[in-house]
Amino acid sequence: MKKLLIVEDDKNWADILCGYAAAVGAEARTVVSGGQAMEMIDNWQPDAIVLDILLAGETAVALLNELRSHADLARLPIVVCSNADVNLEDLRPFGVGALLDKASMRPDEARAIFSEVFNGTE
């Protein structure tokens, strides 16, 4: 079973994203900060990450930079999920492969992106 780490400080959104992960046959775990994410990555070794770009008290960009600085994590698939006005092309240098807009995201869109991410991690 594929493993998805969800870094999301809004419990409602974390629960929604966990449901989408389950729908594509993935096991999901959630954390609320970049520090917790790095600890979970070390201990659990997820196959992919979904990251809210606007974490309370810290920036997701700091986590993205941290991930890129580790050779064993640099290729970890990352999906950004946010209400923020962000452009996927601006995030690609940080290793982000997909972007989900919380304001307009449909369940089928999220499931399709999760499936695509996991198909690329075979």
Label each PLM-derived region with a short phrase.
Residues 8, 82:
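Conserved acidic carboxylate
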Residues 11-29:
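Two-component/phosphorelay signaling modules centered on CheY-like receiver
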Residues 30-48, 109:
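Acidic, metal-coordinating helix/loop segments flanking the phosphotransfer/catalytic sites
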Residues 33, 59-62:
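Acidic catalytic/metal-coordinating carboxylates
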Residues 52:
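Active-site residues of response regulator receiver
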Residues 56:
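The feature encodes the CheY-like receiver
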Residues 61-62, 83-116:
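Alpha4 helix (beta4-alpha4-beta5 surface) of REC/receiver domains from two-component response regulators
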Residues 61-74:
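Short amphipathic alpha-helix used as the core "switch/output" element in two-component signaling
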